Amino acid sequence: MVPAASALAGCSPSSPSVSVAYEQFRFTCCVNSESLTHAWHPGQSITLQWSTESAGMTADDAQHPITLMATVTGPYASVVALKASGAHATTLTASPIRVTDRTSGGVVSTIALPLDLAPGWYNLATTIQSAGSRTGGATIIEVTPPTS
């Protein structure tokens, strides 16, 4: 009977509590950025690969929403005109991707270039929205007429 009493003593309220930690992730775009610099043609699709990296551990068990967005605006007659933030005629938008800070895998955004898209210089912008803040980046792409 003595062993049972000692086993019960180990379960007393003075035992240490168990802590749980959750891994958080942050997103960046674009893993495939070097492939975005070639000339694009109407009818093609731009694929943006979002990647994740660990943002550390937390005891907070709540998942925090993150929205990943991408847009293409233009055309501009030149890179100088694009950088001057002049008016543009076209805005193409990828479907927003909704994830959380617990999403550990990469995701993909796609923007289809319409067949009637005018040639010129376009701004490809990416945005990460989380907890009321926004961060992002941009790159310049060129759309040229399709080759025969």
Locate the predicted segments by residue.
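C-terminal motif of bacterial Sec signal peptides marking the signal peptidase cleavage site
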Residues: 7-10
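Contiguous segments within soluble domain cores/interaction surfaces
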Residues: 15-108
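Beta-strand-connecting loops/turns
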Residues: 43, 119-120
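Short, surface-exposed loop/turn segments at beta-strand-coil junctions that are enriched for proline
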Residues: 112-118
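Beta-strand-rich extracellular modules
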Residues: 127-131
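Short beta-strand elements
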Residues: 132-148
